[in-house]
Amino acid sequence: MGRGSFEIIKQIVDSILSTIYGIEEKCIICEEYEENDYICEKCKKSINIINIESSIIHEDEELKSYSLGFYGYELKKLILKLKYNKSFLAGKILASYMSEFILKNLKDKVDILTFIPSSKSALKNRGFNQCEVLCKYISKSCKIPYKELLYKASDSIDQIGLDNIKRWENIKDSFMVKNKKYIEGKRVLIIDDVITSGATAFYAAKAIKEINSDEVFILTVAKSRV
């Protein structure tokens, strides 16, 4: 059994114990006691969903990009809880906002979902890919199929801390495509957690476009202000 499966089972067990023994629930963000929901009303109102639409233009190509909001405050806290604290509840909450955006804006424009793959080292350390977690929840909510279409051909340096020029150089030619039969003639939506320079999204989309996909978009939880 993989570490990712173990963490999911642990979340389920914790939920069952909470129900049986009446363990107090806390707001996932501020950790104050919250009787009726996983997010208190104060934190819920502070989640700033503004639906950012932008274009990533590079090498004379354009990629349409969507993000729920900017990377900071409550959105950032939820992303970090999913990514580093292994809170699948945080992932489910974020995915619900992403699903709402898709149903309102992209439902008739998307045939299949996929996600940005983790490097082998990140997957080994974390035990799961947070983008895949989001993608699974979104697929179920929106009733859009998802498939693992990308993998990293080699482990690049972590993008965190690199300037924009080095980000583009570091990630170029990193992505390879699999399950090609699910791509040809399809409109593909790639799911990611945070977009910064756009280099990762651009080269992931470019790899898919080369397999005769009809169109490729990217949807992220947040967009960095950098």
Question: Whereabouts are the PLM-identified features?
Answer:
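Glycine-rich phosphate/pyrophosphate-handling loop used in enzymes and phosphotransfer proteins
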Residues: 1-192, 196-226
